[in-house]
UniProtKB/Swiss-Prot annotation:
Location, primary (coarse class): cytoplasm
Organism: Gallus gallus (Chicken)
One Pfam family, short name: FCH
Keywords: Cell junction, Cell membrane, Cell projection, Coiled coil, Cytoplasm, Cytoplasmic vesicle, Cytoskeleton, Endocytosis, Endosome, Lipid-binding, Membrane, Phosphoprotein, SH3 domain
Tissue expr: Detected in intestine, cardiac muscle, lung and brain (at protein level). Expressed in all tissues tested, including, gizzard, liver, cardiac muscle, skeletal muscle and skin.
A biological process from GO: actin cytoskeleton organization
Segments carrying motif NPF1: 367-369
Family: Belongs to the PACSIN family.
The protein, known as: Protein kinase C and casein kinase substrate in neurons protein 2
Post-translational modification: Phosphorylated on serine residues.
Ranges where the F-BAR domain occurs: 11-282
Region (Disordered): 315-386
Topology versus the membrane: Peripheral membrane protein
Length: 448
């Protein structure tokens, strides 16, 4: 029988096991996380390149923030530890040479961007082709088994209802025998009701047992099909993990100023930490904790659950009185965020959910390392107070303002830049509706 299929309707999920209906979605989400992690790693390298041009204090702040972002993000295992090793290195380094910036942006950043473009293919309707293929594969593998599971649940419910009805019919018949006012015809009807209820019990029990047996017979094939799709997802993730390890090692080489004696020990330790990254070990961990290695409570024949249901119904009513008005929700504790020295410091895709431009230049308006006048009278840290001509710009990416003084716009929108980029990478601008606020400078381009 053809038709649309929703694996989340009509089936009770009793655990978080991979084998439960719909629980494969965590594996599918990992594909989207892989694309997101590419953005995060590019952002990480992009920020590191900027930090190469400023003082050790800013480098330390970068390391602190990114260590927290990586630890809270979806990356896991030995690759996560290898990634975090860069932050440990940054905390130990007081300053780095400016030529490192060129290698980070022109080689490593571009390599990740190109790999991401080749590995993930966007669809016109949104999402990625790789995610949809995994979703469709799991759905197809689970659909027959989920259908039989729904039949088991329905048969179990019918059987338990028949058992309950039989008990009630027997109870009525027993009570009627002690009632002298009841005529024989009424008694006969009650006896017939008992007989019919017994037949219903036998019939529903047989159907319950049959559907459960069919489910058991379908389970091996279900497991095989699900395992096959899961392994395809594992192979895709393995490519990403190995690529991340490769990129991290290349970044390490660019950062390793081996001609400076004080840096030798730092980078020797960093290389050792990265080389401990093991994709096989990470995949094995994911399999055991999020995949087929998880345990599963397979459905078993339950004879008297209807009786327990009656007791639970009463218990739930009483408990509800005590728990009315108490609601637990997921709370995003913004207070747990790491405090930043500046409200508009550069952010990661976890904080602003942003993408990054294909081109990047170190010619920043407030660059503390930019050349001054010949006399040396200009302080590179003085704020530029000269008037700025307003310029029309076009948004390259979507941006959702996170603070009251930030603008929100969509890719392709036009706005007016009112002030040049500040030292944190923000510009002041005005939307066509008159709203004035801040926005990331690298999210727009001048209109030619």
């Amino acid at each position: 029988m053809s038709g649309s299929y929703d694996d989340s309707v009509g089936v009770e999920v009793s655990s978080d096991s991979f084998w439960e209906v719909g629980n494969y979605k965590r594996t599918v989400k990992r594909i989207d996380d892989g694309h997101r992690l590419c953005n995060d790693l590019m952002n990480c390298i992009h920020e590191r390149a900027r930090i190469e041009k400023v003082y050790a204090q800013q480098l330390t702040e970068w390391a602190k923030r990114w260590k927290q972002l990586v630890e809270k993000g979806p990356q896991y295992g030995t690759v996560e530890r290898a990634w975090c090793a860069f932050m440990s290195e940054a905390e130990k380094v007081s300053e780095l040479h400016l030529e490192v910036k060129g290698s980070l942006m022109n080689e490593d950043f571009e390599k990740i961007k190109n790999w991401q473009k080749e590995a993930f293919h966007k669809q016109m309707m949104g999402g990625f082709k790789e995610t949809k293929e995994a979703e469709d594969g799991f759905r197809k593998a689970q659909k027959p088994w989920a259908k039989k599971l729904k039949e088991v649940e329905a048969a179990k419910k019918a059987y338990h209802a028949a058992c309950k009805e039989e008990k009630l019919a027997i109870s009525r018949e027993t009570n009627s025998k002690a009632d002298p006012a009841l005529n024989p015809e009424q008694l006969k009807k009650l006896q017939d009701k008992v007989e019919r209820s017994k037949q219903d019990v036998l019939k529903t029990k047989a159907k319950y047992e049959k559907s459960l047996k069919e489910l058991d017979n379908a389970t091996p094939q279900y497991m095989e099909n699900m395992e096959q799709v899961f392994e395809q997802c594992q192979q895709f993730e393995e490519k990403r993990l190995r690529f991340f390890r490769e990129v991290l090692l290349e970044v390490q080489k660019h950062l390793d100023l081996s001609n400076v004696a004080s840096y030798k020990n730092i980078y020797r330790e960093l290389e050792q930490n990265i080389k401990t990254a093991d994709a096989v070990e990470d995949l094995r961990w994911f399999r055991a904790n999020q995949g087929p290695g998880m345990s599963m409570n397979w459905p078993q024949f339950e004879d008297d659950e209807w009786s327990a249901d009656l007791n639970r119904t009463l218990s739930r009513r009483e408990k509800k009185k005590a728990s009315d008005g108490v609601t637990l929700t997921g709370i995003n504790q913004t207070g747990d965020q790491v405090s930043q020295p500046n409200k508009h410091s550069s952010v990661s895709s976890y904080e602003k959910n942003q993408s990054y431009p294909t081109d990047w230049s170190d010619e920043e308006s407030n660059n503390p390392f930019s050349s001054t006048d010949a006399k040396g009278d200009t302080n590179p840290f003085d704020e530029d107070t000269s008037p700025v001509m307003e310029v029309r710009v076009r948004a390259l990416y979507d941006y959702e303002g996170q603070e009251q003084d930030e603008l929100s716009f969509k890719a392709g929108d036009e706005l007016t830049k009112m002030e040049n980029e500040d030292e944190q990478g923000w510009c002041k601008g005005r939307l066509d509706n008159g709203q004035v606020g801040l926005y990331p400078a690298n999210y727009v381009e001048p209109i030619q």
